[in-house]
From Swiss-Prot:
Post-translational modification: Cleavage of precursor form by a sentrin-specific protease is necessary for function.
Species for this entry: Danio rerio (Zebrafish)
Protein name (Swiss-Prot/TrEMBL): Small ubiquitin-related modifier 1
This protein's encoding gene: sumo1
Subunit structure: Interacts with sae2, ube2i, ranbp2, pias1 and pias2. Covalently attached to a number of proteins.
Main location: nucleus
């Protein structure tokens, strides 16, 4: 995923379906991992790759783009992502009740 070469856009405009964009994934600790993905690739692959590199289960993380949660079946094209866009990652928090 991250080793593929980018094809230059012939028209200099919008990305075509087969083209790649670079995405920056930023964790809660401000660590950055860069991914190069196709516009039509389901973001499930990026999520799985990120969680594998971090050594945590993918279901323990929440991925957000522009404040909206990213589901597995979405693609960068569907989300209107562009080169160098940022995906934020947060640890899933469960439980937590107040004791009064």
């Amino acid at each position: 995923m991250s080793d593929t070469e980018t094809k230059p856009s012939s028209d200099g405009g919008e990305k075509k379906d087969g083209e790649y964009i670079k995405l920056k994934v930023i964790g809660q600790d401000n660590s950055e991992i860069h991914f190069k993905v196709k516009m039509t690739t389901h973001l499930k692959k990026l999520k799985e790759s990120y969680s594998q590199r971090q050594g945590v289960p993918v279901n323990s993380l929440r991925f957000l783009f522009e404040g909206q949660r990213i589901t597995d079946n979405l693609t960068p094209k569907e989300l209107g992502m562009e080169d160098e866009d940022v995906i934020e990652v947060y640890q899933e928090q469960t439980g937590g009740c107040r004791n009064d």
